[in-house]
Amino acid sequence: MEGAFAANWSAEAVNGSAAPPGTEGNRTAGPPQRNEALARVEVAVLCLILFLALSGNACVLLALRTTRHKHSRLFFFMKHLSIADLVVAVFQVLPQLLWDITFRFYGPDLLCRLVKYLQVVGMFASTYLLLLMSLDRCLAICQPLRSLSRRTDRLAVLVTWLGCLVASAPQVHIFSLREVADGVFDCWAVFIQPWGPKAYITWITLAVYIVPVIVLATCYGLISFKIWQNLRLKTAAAAAEAAAGAEGEAADWAGRAILARVSNVKLISKAKIRTVKMTFIVVLAFIVCWTPFFFVQMWSVWDADAPKEASPFIIAMLLASLNSCCNPWIYMLFTGHLFQELVQRFLCCSFRRLKGSRPGETSVSKKSNSSTFVLSQYSSSQRRCSQPSTL
């Protein structure tokens, strides 16, 4: 994530031998230097993030593909959010990892622009697909009869992806392959000085962080109010029913009136509340991971004396990518049956392969009495594989 849309500070030395992005001239004769110890820490952190993001989100997609409930609306949004997290891992974390290993960008100008473009596409997609999933949960709780249809879900996701592709387009113009020192080229940003970096980073912060957080907070505020209202009315209805037996018909009519008021919120089932809890934890992880990143990005462009080469400053920029690692584990926590089905299917199919490769099994199955037993046992194994558990 570091340097995705701002200057690619990386672990360059504090002596400032490399020319800053967006400036002409002012180059030095010697090659740029960097803090090698900090660079090794960056590489180690990015390797860990890449492994966790790839493995976790791949498991989520595989589990969603094999589950019997693959047409669930929540699972539909989870699938696209996992795809967005894979885009972050492949097109953002991996290029940054290679970049930190080589120190400089080794590739043509077209590749430089493409890498910077795709880095921000993943960032936008991960944010706005999470926002879309939260809006869906808000509608499911607050307006259950007006919730989105399957066709509308697909259209909303398609528009979100297209919007992310369009919103990332400025990266192609801002970044290019430039000479940052005598004979040294790198993929750098070109801004109109002095207000260009401030305007662009502020816009990105508003679009990717501040506005989504405000919308997410509003959604979960409405959800919390609706759940509180649901609990309060149900408690009142239970009290009225209890009083009906003691006070006669008048109390019975009062209880019915309260039950009529609560009928529309009875649709808030435990399953829906559980999905709300899951998306809330995902949103909380989003805020925790992205806040340090945007804080240091804004600090770097609005304060000329910002410690851009300090270790905490650099590491804070890497934390945003942790969001793509956290989401799969949150899914596992709240939808454990998905992964139980995946593991059961894997173990069952492995057992079938091992059983089919045993020598002498064919000759045994030809016996008149035992053949029925073997075939029935094998077919039941097939049924267990094709029909995963619903736990």
From Swiss-Prot:
The domain of life is: Eukaryota
Q: Where are the transmembrane segments?
A: 39-63, 75-97, 114-135, 155-175, 203-225, 278-296, 312-334
Q: Which Pfam families match?
A: 7tm_1
Q: Which InterPro entries match?
A: GPCR_Rhodpsn, GPCR_Rhodpsn_7TM, Oxytocn_rcpt, Vasoprsn_rcpt
Q: Which cysteines are joined by disulfide bonds?
A: 112-187
Q: Which residues carry this modification: Phosphoserine?
A: 368, 370
Q: Which PANTHER family match?
A: NEUROPEPTIDE RECEPTOR-RELATED G-PROTEIN COUPLED RECEPTOR, OXYTOCIN RECEPTOR
Q: What is this protein called?
A: Oxytocin receptor
Please report the organism this UniProt entry assigns to the protein.
Bos taurus (Bovine)
